[in-house]
Design a protein with these regions (language model features):
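Polybasic/polar functional segments that serve as interface/processing modules
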Residues: 1-87
Length: 87
């Protein structure tokens, strides 16, 4: 297997009261401090009109050859984060 980078997954429970824009701001700050280039970032409040997702948000920082994502399920207090950093 060829080494390509680091992949981290975080699942947290009892994470109540989170704000997507606050988390996105912190994700952007962490990515910048880690020396990566943020090429796009957004946070979407869920459910979107016509969608069937439970209440919460999805926040995304697309990085140069990497990504940092967060999915938050407000009613269940669940936060799932995924971080991939290329080399």
């Amino acid at each position: 297997m060829i080494y390509k980078g680091h992949h981290y997954i975080l699942d947290a429970s009892e994470a109540y009261g989170l704000c997507g824009h606050w988390l996105l701001k912190n994700m952007n700050e962490v990515a910048t401090k880690a020396g990566t280039t943020v090429v796009f970032k957004t946070s979407v409040q869920l459910p979107v009109t016509g969608g069937s997702s439970p209440p919460g948000f999805t926040s995304v920082c697309l990085l140069d050859e990497s990504h940092l994502t967060a999915h938050y399920y407000e009613d269940k207090g669940l936060l799932a984060m995924d971080v991939w950093k290329h080399r």
